[in-house]
């Protein structure tokens, strides 16, 4: 069983997916973490982490590194780098690198391989998860929230250098990039359960989703 969660950046996908995983005893995967790890690989290869590298160069770098999945996390060369990928510098570049078709193909293949060779149930979150990666998943969710709310959430999560206004601009720019991507653009898929989380807490959102999920299972019996 796969529960797929889609939606824009900072809409609550990761927090909600993690909590649902605990409540439902499902394994949690974030495709966004994979793209962030790849962005970290790119940044480590450059003298100036604000520069960008070409798609071909990045594809070659990925081959030189080992990205694996273990205990609910993607590892880079055996190291859990989560504390190195959730920052403003990664935020600024990840949407650029995730627009490379070759990079998206690698990430999508990696995600499908993890699920294919496992008998576990999964909650997988990320942009285009419901439309491209797992469009056939049994339960599809699209989480949304206003830009102001999403910026405030990210501001509270981070101790970075960006102001609230700068975060709003960053999220608007990223939304624009994600919605205009040639491949894997951000959009609603057919049969998705849409939920605006702007003024809902984590518990409320999870309760709504679980109620909808259980109702769906009853109807399909």
Swiss-Prot record:
Keywords: ATP-binding, Cytoplasm, Kinase, Nucleotide-binding, Transferase
Any one cellular-component term (Gene Ontology): cytoplasm
Pfam entry (one): Cytidylate_kin
A GO biological-process term: pyrimidine nucleotide metabolic process
Regions that span the bilayer: none
Record-linked InterPro entries: Cytidylate_kin, Cytidylate_kinase_dom, P-loop_NTPase
Main location: cytoplasm
Catalyses which reaction(s): CMP + ATP = CDP + ADP; dCMP + ATP = dCDP + ADP
Binding site for ATP: 7-15
Keyword Nucleotide-binding in annotation: yes
Gene3D superfamilies: P-loop containing nucleotide triphosphate hydrolases
Subcellular location: Cytoplasm
GO molecular function list: ATP binding; CMP kinase activity; dCMP kinase activity
Record EC number: 2.7.4.25
Family: Belongs to the cytidylate kinase family. Type 1 subfamily.
Protein name, per record: Cytidylate kinase 1
Organism: Borreliella burgdorferi (strain ATCC 35210 / DSM 4680 / CIP 102532 / B31)
Species classification: Bacteria, Pseudomonadati, Spirochaetota, Spirochaetia, Spirochaetales
